[in-house]
Swiss-Prot record:
Residues 1-23 form the signal peptide. The record marks 32 as: Important for agonist activity on V1aR/AVPR1A. This is Vasopressin-neurophysin 2-copeptin. Interacts with vasopressin receptors V1bR/AVPR1B (Ki=85 pM), V1aR/AVPR1A (Ki=0.6 nM) and V2R/AVPR2 (Ki=4.9 nM). Interacts with oxytocin receptor (OXTR) (Ki=110 nM). It comes from the Eukaryota. Glycans are attached at residue 135. Keywords: Amidation, Cleavage on pair of basic residues, Disulfide bond, Glycoprotein, Hormone, Secreted, Signal, Vasoactive, Vasoconstrictor.
Length: 168
């Protein structure tokens, strides 16, 4: 009788331990565990936006040099696929803000949001001009400065309601 109770108790403990430990595994950990990510090379994030000209910065953020950033719009839907890929990625040129990277002219994005950032203005205009062949829709200096100023004003007067889709 004692052996049967001991056997039942031991089986119950083993099953409880198995149930507890199986709940601790994450499905999207990188190969080799989370510490192995420093050894892995970062790949370019998925292309997104009109004509695939942009790059994903987060699950709902798509930015392109010439087009700006799309937040929570149809152009950024493809970026949700990044959550299911096993290797880490990085978009943008140089680090900016608090954990973000320069995404477009004057815009700094992290994986959660974008803000106007003056230090991200450098280099984008030259890069855009080098890429364009002869595009009549490209903005000239004064128009570009006005648009950039409007983006900066929108970033400083951003409302609390961030659930609405936005395009920067």
């Amino acid at each position: 009788m004692l052996a049967m109770m001991l056997n039942t108790t031991l089986s119950a403990c083993f099953l409880s331990l198995l149930a507890l430990t199986s709940a601790c595994y994450f499905q999207n950990c990188p190969r080799g565990g989370k510490r192995a990510t420093s050894d892995m090379e970062l790949r370019q994030c998925l292309p997104c936006g009109p004509g695939g000209k942009g790059r994903c910065f987060g699950p709902s953020i798509c930015c392109a040099d010439e087009l700006g950033c799309f937040l929570g719009t149809a152009e950024a839907l493809r970026c949700q696929e990044e959550n299911y890929l096993p290797s880490p990625c990085q978009s943008g040129q140089k680090p900016c803000g608090s954990g973000g990277r320069c995404a477009a002219a004057g815009i700094c994005c992290s994986d959660e949001s974008c803000v106007a950032e003056p230090e991200c203005r450098e280099g984008f205009f030259r890069l855009t001009r080098a890429r364009e062949q002869s595009n009549a829709t490209q903005l000239d200096g004064p128009a570009r400065e006005l648009l950039l100023r409007l983006v900066q004003l929108a970033g400083t007067q951003e409302s609390v309601d961030s659930a609405k889709p936005r395009v920067y």
